[in-house]
Amino acid sequence: MKLITFTVPCYNSAAYMDHCIETLLTAGEDAEIILVDDGSKDDTGKIADAYAEKYPTIVRVIHQENGGHGEAVNTGIRNATGLYFKVVDSDDWVDLDAYRKILDKLREISGGDRVLDMFIANYVYEKEGVKHKKVMRCSNLPKDRIFTWKEAGHFHKGQYILMHSVIYRTKLLVECGLELPKHTF
């Protein structure tokens, strides 16, 4: 079993998806990367297929009619085989140093006797051409340890957890029957 499945929803992503995929590939055989071509009209599907051909033990491609971001995520969940699951949008990428630390921590936790349902990390929202980066921080959550929701306390107004900052235990998502609405982001 792979350590983590990354689902990458792709819609007309040909111009920028390479950067996303290349950063995810640095995990090597620990990762399963599912590229969901959500009915793209450009070369997204061809690019995705080329990655699957070049990295057959890591990359899988699913071509589907356009169902929107939510349906692409649902497709990823239904097809994920990794112990953990994360969505990375095709116009996003991972910071390699942070990525290595997260993978090391997931390896460490997965070898223990406790079950981890969610792994939360800070997320940087960086828009091309904008000078200031917005860092989404979960500052009131305990750091560097496993904790319960009771320990997490309450979130402050304007504070929330983005899907982009969470890694889920795949089995949890499957067992709870998570289904995102079609055509939503």
Name the predicted role of every residue range.
Residues 12-26:
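Short, well-formed alpha-helical segments that are part of the catalytic scaffolds
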Residues 85:
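Short aromatic/hydrophobic "clamp" motif used to bind/position activated sugar donors
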Residues 23, 37-46, 67-68:
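A conserved acidic beta->alpha catalytic loop
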Residues 43, 92-105:
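Acidic donor-binding/catalytic loop of UDP-sugar-dependent glycosyltransferases
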Residues 149-185:
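Conserved nucleotide-sugar donor-binding catalytic segment
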Residues 64-80:
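Glycine-rich, basic loop-to-helix element that forms the pyrophosphate-binding segment
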Residues 31-39, 60-65, 89-90:
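Short beta-strand/loop segment that forms part of the nucleotide-sugar
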Residues 100-134:
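Conserved donor NDP-sugar-binding/catalytic core segment of glycosyltransferases
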